[in-house]
């Protein structure tokens, strides 16, 4: 429309007289209350509502930044995307929604058979939304494969004499200026007392070495969050991603922080950086533009933020 054309000319023309004409025209339209004409309605040019940090980080550490383990990697990858998710934005991909469903089914299942787990999935399938019947049929095939892979993993752990000591375990503790709170998918203990913390993912692949979520779970062990569940003496074997989205299940483990001092220092440094960033000490959240911005099946869909303030189709 006219407003869009004038706004585009205002920011693109190099001719000073044309810029002035566009500015005057927009001013007249703004006086007439035409939508989008007034600068107050232009995205990206308003000042901060407040320059204050979300959480004041006092020297006595009374100000605590609440951190959820599952959110730290998201913050590292793109602070702006994390901020949107933390304040109402959600990931609507099938993998994310089915992952939530599968976690609940696994928590409630009395046995680890395929029949039992798939029955649980079917009982909750109606909570998922699909755009078309063919889309639903495709996702059913994917879901069945994920359940099959999950059963394969559970059978493998049983053969290795690992037992489940906790599922959806609440962790809630202070770590410096951070208050850590979340739930751990699985806590398993091996025949020699070794404890493995497991995070179930519906992806086909994932890196574990510097995964901050796994690192925080290990720090939770070191802060005695699982003492009531595990048998003593116990050692921390590490934390692992359980990936069920591929042709077969796979695991990717992070080495024990109790045995890798360098990795432990790295994880604590990541948390310190997240504390400063999540509390908005610098009053901004950086947008790290990348492929995740426009991939609805990947990290998230932020394509709306990539749309220029003034667009024109002529």
Question: What would you call each of these model-derived segments?
Answer:
Residues 1-314:
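RecB-family 4Fe-4S metal-dependent nuclease core
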């Amino acid at each position: 429309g006219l407003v869009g054309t004038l706004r585009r000319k205002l920011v693109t023309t190099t001719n000073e007289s044309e810029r002035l004409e566009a500015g005057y025209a927009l001013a007249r339209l703004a006086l007439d209350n035409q939508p989008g004409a007034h600068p107050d309605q232009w995205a990206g040019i308003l000042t901060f509502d407040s320059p204050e940090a979300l959480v004041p980080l006092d020297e006595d550490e009374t100000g605590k930044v609440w951190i959820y383990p599952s959110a730290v990697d998201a913050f590292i990858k793109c602070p702006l995307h994390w901020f949107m998710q933390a304040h109402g934005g959600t990931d609507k991909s099938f993998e994310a929604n089915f992952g939530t469903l599968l976690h609940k089914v696994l928590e409630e299942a009395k046995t680890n058979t395929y029949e039992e787990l798939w029955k649980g999935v079917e009982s909750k399938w109606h909570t998922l939304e699909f755009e078309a019947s063919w889309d639903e049929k495709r996702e059913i095939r994917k879901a069945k494969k994920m359940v099959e892979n999950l059963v394969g993993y559970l059978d493998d752990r049983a053969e290795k004499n690992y037992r489940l000591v906790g599922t959806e375990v609440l962790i809630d503790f202070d770590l410096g200026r951070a208050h850590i709170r979340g739930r751990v998918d699985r806590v398993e203990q091996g025949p020699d007392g070794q404890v493995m913390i497991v995070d179930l993912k519906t992806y086909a692949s994932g890196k574990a070495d510097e995964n901050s979520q796994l690192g925080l779970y290990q720090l939770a062990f070191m802060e005695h969050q699982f003492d009531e569940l595990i048998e003593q003496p116990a050692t921390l074997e590490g934390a692992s991603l359980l990936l069920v989205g591929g042709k077969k299940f796979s695991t990717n483990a992070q080495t024990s922080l109790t045995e890798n001092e360098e990795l432990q220092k790295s994880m604590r440094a990541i948390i310190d950086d997240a504390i400063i960033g999540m509390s908005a000490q610098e009053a901004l959240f950086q947008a790290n533009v990348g492929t995740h911005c426009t991939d609805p099946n990947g990290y998230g869909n932020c394509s709306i933020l990539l749309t220029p303030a003034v667009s024109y189709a002529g």
